[in-house]
């Protein structure tokens, strides 16, 4: 009889920042002969994305509470308990050797269910400030890992697992060598876009004209409006500037290869990808009570690879002045500094902890 494959259940959902790092670890362990199963929710992005990657997915019913009102808060304990029992049934049927929690609503009930079944939980916090669910789960997890220092006092810093195509990009010295002319500005508002960038960057194009070429990911439903804003600002200032606006960039590695500098939010995965790619950045952190995105971006600013502009301080002039002050020599230095702080073997580090925990 052949030996039973090791089994991992990945708990991750809701946003690309949770799902893509989970997929990176899943694919790595599949290449090592592991069987992978995913725990998610049927109405979030993992339901479409994970099966496309050849991984079987199971669902529990759970959602966030923010903005749901008093009735939802009262019903929450019952819904959470039901979700835990749904997850327990899945765990008992699949019998994983370890469970990896990468974040999203599903991780809370899934982590408790795994712990109650005696299955070791490995927790990975992608952000510089730990979310409430991960703070709770850290008390029952076998191992806790963090992408950035500061989320947990004593957890090892392993970085964020990044997609292979981003890791495969040329080093900045090769990629940026010989470039001249307009600075190539990549604008990323996250998979959902960022309205403030959609409103601000067309004005920046109007201020800088032919000095910049812009590739702008506007987010779902925002492409037409953002294109119109570019047209109006360039016409108003009687200047020309090349720009491309899309709802979503399917091949982000190609976009990083093209870019000289990135203007974006500072979600955990975005920051980690920009560091791995070796790109200078202007980060505009999403305003959250924990300032989570600010802390994500701070290591790159401290390294001299980026500038953080808080949303309250954001003006078109602030971005335009920053871009004008960064000549090509400066951009090259910043790109190399960004890559110097990247943790490029994060996938292997997380996978090795899972392998270690599963053997015990």
From Swiss-Prot:
Membrane topology qualifier: Peripheral membrane protein
Molecular-function annotations in GO: UDP-N-acetyl-D-glucosamine:N-acetylmuramoyl-L-alanyl-D-glutamyl-meso-2,6-diaminopimelyl-D-alanyl-D-alanine-diphosphoundecaprenol 4-beta-N-acetylglucosaminlytransferase activity; undecaprenyldiphospho-muramoylpentapeptide beta-N-acetylglucosaminyltransferase activity
Keywords, comma-separated and alphabetical: Cell cycle, Cell division, Cell inner membrane, Cell membrane, Cell shape, Cell wall biogenesis/degradation, Glycosyltransferase, Membrane, Peptidoglycan synthesis, Transferase
Pfam families registered for this protein in UniProt: Glyco_tran_28_C (PF04101), Glyco_transf_28 (PF03033)
Keyword presence, Membrane: yes
Binding residues annotated for UDP-N-acetyl-alpha-D-glucosamine, in chain numbering: 15-17, 127, 163, 191, 249, 268-273, 293
CDD domains registered for this protein in UniProt: GT28_MurG (cd03785)
EC numbers: 2.4.1.227
Record-given protein name: UDP-N-acetylglucosamine--N-acetylmuramyl-(pentapeptide) pyrophosphoryl-undecaprenol N-acetylglucosamine transferase
Organism placement in taxonomy: Bacteria, Pseudomonadati, Pseudomonadota, Gammaproteobacteria, Enterobacterales
